[in-house]
Amino acid sequence: MNVLLGGLVIFATFVTLCNGSCYLMPNKMVPGDSTKECTDLKGNKHPLNSRWKTENCDECDCLEKEISCCSLVAIPVGYDQDNCQKIFKQEDCKYIVVEKKDPNKTCEVTQWI
């Protein structure tokens, strides 16, 4: 029993860390319209039960009543902020942490959110 409980605690912690930045948008259905799709914030249409990645590094799901989106970006917080800086790489949807004096050298990161 303790093993199961411990496993659930670890799983819940992992899920919390992975889903740190999510949001929901209502899926605007027009009464009498039988189309099964979602319209994102840019006006693009997506089939029901589909998944896509936005240019803002969110992963979104088209559900029947809503669009669910979660950030794919982990933000570094455990690093030497006096000597290092974080740089966002849009094309990879990730941060790198480098030395301020020599941006060719990476810094150690001990914690991400």
Curated annotation (Swiss-Prot):
Compartments where found: Secreted
Disulfide bonds: C22-C70, C38-C62, C57-C93, C60-C69, C84-C107
GO cellular component: extracellular region
Pfam families listed in its UniProt record: PSP94 (PF05825)
Signal sequence, start to end: 1-20
InterPro entries per record: PSP94
Key words, A-Z: Disulfide bond, Secreted, Signal
Organism domain of life: Eukaryota
Family to which the UniProt record says this protein belongs: Belongs to the beta-microseminoprotein family.
This protein's name: Beta-microseminoprotein A1
Encoding gene per record: MSPA
